[in-house]
C-alpha cells in the first residue's frame, strides 16, 4: 500500500502562521515525519512526502506527484486559523471533497474520532470542501486540521512535541483501522532497521552536509548529520 503525506504549505507561505509568528508548516512537517516512522512499521506500506523543506511545492505539483505514483491514500496535515488575530475558535475537523466520496468519508470519520479521543479537543466533525488537494487527487484523500493557531491555548499545544506525536499517532491509528494494516513482525522490523541505514560523506564543511540532509528530508528520507 502506498500512502502520501502532505505537510500543508511551506516555511515561506504568506499568512500561514500564528499571530505571534509560528509558521504552520513547522507543525505540519513534524507530524508528517512522526507519521512516516509509524506507518513504516506496517506490512507492505510505502510512504511518500508531497512537500519539501527546501522549497514551496505548489498544490498542483503535490497532486500530480500523488497521481503519478498512484498512491492509495493521500493525507494532508494542517493547523487551522480563523482570521489573523487571537480569538476563541477551537477544535479539530477533517475534510473530504465536496461530493463526499464514501471511502474518504469513512477514513475521515475514523481519523477524526481518534484525534478527538487522543487530544480531548472540541469535535468540529467531518466536513466537505473544494480544496485542491481533495479535488485533484485520484485516490482516497482527506485533509486534517489539528487545532487553531489563532487560539492561544491551542497554539501552545501545536508548539508541543508531545501534542505533535499525539496527533501523528491518532491519524495513523485511523488509517490503520480503515485499511486494516498489520504490524510487521519483530524479525521484519529488525531486518528493516539493519538494511536501510546509509552513511553519506564525509564532508569537510558542516554546511555542505546540512544542505544534503535538507534535500534528503525533502524527498522523504530520515536524514541527520553526525560530527566526528
Predicted regions mapped to residue ranges:
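Active-site-proximal helix/loop segments of hydrolytic enzymes
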Residues: 2, 11-13, 19-190
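Extracellular repeat turn/loop positions enriched in glycine and acidic/polar residues, especially those
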Residues: 8
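Solvent-exposed beta-strand motifs enriched in subsets of small alpha/beta binding domains
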Residues: 184-228
Amino acid at each position: 500500500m502506498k500512502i502520501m503525506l502532505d505537510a500543508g504549505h511551506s516555511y515561506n507561505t504568506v499568512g500561514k502562521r500564528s499571530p505571534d509568528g509560528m509558521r504552520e508548516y513547522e507543525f505540519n512537517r513534524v507530524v508528517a515525519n512522526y507519521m512516516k516512522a509509524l506507518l513504516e512499521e506496517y506490512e507492505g506500506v510505502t510512504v511518500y512526502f508531497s512537500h519539501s523543506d527546501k522549497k514551496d511545492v505548489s498544490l498542483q505539483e503535490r497532486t500530480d506527484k500523488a497521481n503519478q505514483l498512484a498512491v492509495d491514500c493521500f493525507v494532508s496535515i494542517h493547523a487551522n486559523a480563523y482570521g489573523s488575530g487571537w480569538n476563541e475558535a477551537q477544535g479539530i475537523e477533517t475534510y473530504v471533497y465536496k461530493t463526499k466520496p464514501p471511502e474518504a468519508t469513512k477514513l475521515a470519520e475514523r481519523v477524526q474520532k481518534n484525534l478527538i479521543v487522543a487530544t480531548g479537543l472540541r469535535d468540529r466533525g467531518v466536513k466537505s470542501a473544494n480544496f485542491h488537494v481533495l479535488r485533484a487527487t485520484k485516490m482516497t484523500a482527506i485533509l486534517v486540521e489539528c487545532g487553531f493557531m489563532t487560539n492561544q491555548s491551542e497554539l501552545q499545544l501545536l508548539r508541543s512535541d508531545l501534542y505533535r506525536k499525539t496527533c501523528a499517532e491518532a491519524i495513523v491509528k485511523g488509517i490503520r483501522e480503515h485499511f486494516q494494516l498489520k504490524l510487521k513482525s519483530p524479525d521484519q522490523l529488525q531486518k528493516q532497521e539493519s538494511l536501510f541505514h546509509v552513511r553519506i560523506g564525509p564532508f569537510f564543511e558542516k554546511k555542505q552536509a546540512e544542505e544534503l540532509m535538507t534535500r534528503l528530508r525533502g524527498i522523504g528520507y530520515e536524514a541527520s548529520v553526525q560530527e566526528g
